[in-house]
Regions:
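Outer-membrane beta-barrel biogenesis signature
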Residues: 17-42
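Glycine- and aromatic-enriched membrane insertion/assembly motifs of diderm outer-membrane
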Residues: 45-92
């Protein structure tokens, strides 16, 4: 029974860890540091999650880093490697591999996440754009998962190097064997900082809301 519970927690936490803001193909840049942290809540129930990552650029295309996910009764630490290629304004491609370990089980390996990030402009000025994230998660002792997110976004420039970018999209399994979920939100850019407010599961009794912040130094 304990093993079944642990497997269920691992499945839920890996899906939650993926359900972040949209990721773009490019990496942070040579010698630069990228950081992101978020808090996820479901009003009406005691279900808080956090996700934090730091990534350091190695050249123009590579980055390496760590992440930490915490949820109800679970905590996972991961080490990651990321690659990004800006092909042109219309399409960019990136990939990431993260190996995650269970901090509550003596740092035991739990799951391996492979991600494909793509994005590009739709309009000539680049304000209207698309973004796609594909996630393949290989679990230790349970079924693997394959999911995809597609988003449309529009950047509204403001004064003093600021902007606001609303986005809307869908979350679904790769085989479309589960209900398609709607995700929406926006981020507010202040120079090298972004403030995020995101959400999904809007049609459920306890929707999920995400508040986050990231930076590049």
């Amino acid at each position: 029974m304990r093993k079944i519970v642990l497997i269920l927690i691992m499945l839920l936490s890996s899906v939650s860890a993926m359900a972040q803001i949209p990721y773009y193909a490019g990496t942070v840049g040579d010698g630069k540091l990228y950081g992101y942290t978020s808090l996820k809540v479901r009003p009406g129930i005691n279900h808080q999650e956090t996700y934090t990552t730091f990534q350091y650029g190695l050249g123009d295309h590579w980055a390496t880093g760590v992440d930490l996910y915490t949820g109800p009764d679970c905590a996972y630490w991961g080490g990651l490697v990321r690659y990004g290629l800006n092909i042109n304004k219309w399409i960019n491609v990136g990939a990431e591999v993260t190996s995650s370990f269970d901090l509550n089980r003596s740092f035991k390996f739990s799951y391996l996440t492979s991600a494909l990030y793509m994005n590009g402009a739709i309009s000539q000025d680049g304000r209207l754009f698309w973004c796609s994230n594909t996630w393949w998660v290989v679990h230790d002792g349970s079924d693997n998962t394959f999911s995809n997110y597609e988003y449309l976004g529009y950047t509204i420039p403001l004064k003093n190097h600021r902007a606001i970018t609303p986005m809307v999209g869908t979350i679904h399994s790769w085989k479309f064997d589960q209900d398609v979920d709607i995700a929406a939100g926006f981020y507010y850019t202040i120079k090298n900082w972004n403030l995020y407010l995101w959400g999904n599961d809007f049609l459920k009794s306890h929707p999920r809301f995400i508040a986050g912040i990231d930076f590049t130094l």
